A protein has these predicted regions:
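Short, surface-exposed linear patches
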Residues: 42-47, 91, 130-135
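His/Glu-rich zincin catalytic helix
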Residues: 1-86, 124-127
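Long, C-terminal folded domains that constitute the functional core of proteins
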Residues: 113, 130-131, 163-166
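M16 family metallopeptidases and their MPP-like homologs
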Residues: 86-129
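Acidic/histidine-enriched alpha-helical segments
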Residues: 133-156
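Short, low-order "capping/linker" segments at domain edges
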Residues: 149-169
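Low-complexity, compositionally biased segments
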Residues: 30, 42, 118-119, 134, ...
Length: 169
């Protein structure tokens, strides 16, 4: 963990069929996603809302995206990251997110893979991006009264604009 991270991988196990990662959340304020986070995530992971997802609100990740755990968002971003570079058009990746210890803000994310190195890189990128999104949200909370973020119209709705962040991969 770096000194100011809000989410990080605490432990990873590579199994023959999946990666199991323990994801630590820094504090309770960082546990859940928000609509703004999802809008920004869609710039990098445009198919997130269409992922099949077992949940209490619908059949896709979109049904819960703006009110789910950040660890669950990491799962879906890591899966989409793998799908992007997958060797087969019919590749199917599955994942599961659960709380290993909710009181200690420790989640367990499991994702299947074709190539373990691609899966690990996708997981790393997803965690770094989730941390960036949480930092943006935190900064927005502390900068009340400053100039608003640039917005754009998408499907008739105003949303945060797409952006680039430096990647030191």
């Amino acid at each position: 963990m770096s000194g100011s991270s809000r989410v990080w991988v605490e432990h990873v196990t590579v199994r023959p069929d999946r990666i199991v990662a323990d994801i630590r959340i820094a504090d309770e304020a960082c546990v859940l996603t928000s609509e703004d986070m999802i809008d920004k995530a869609l710039c990098r992971y445009p198919h997130l809302l269409d992922h099949a997802c077992v949940n209490d609100w619908g059949e896709t990740f979109g049904a819960v995206a703006s009110r789910t755990s950040v660890a669950h968002l990491v799962e879906h971003m890591a899966i989409e990251g793998q799908a992007r570079v997958s060797s087969g058009a019919k590749s199917l990746f599955v994942g599961k997110t659960s709380w290993a210890n909710r009181a200690k803000l420790l989640a367990r994310v499991e994702i299947s893979y074709e190539d373990d190195l691609v899966a690990l890189a996708s997981l790393r990128a997803a965690v770094l991006f989730a941390d960036y999104l949480l930092a943006e949200r935190e900064e927005a909370r502390f900068c009340v009264g400053e100039a608003p973020l640039k917005t754009e119209k998408r499907n008739g709705n105003e949303s945060a604009g797409c952006f680039r962040i430096p990647y030191n991969g």
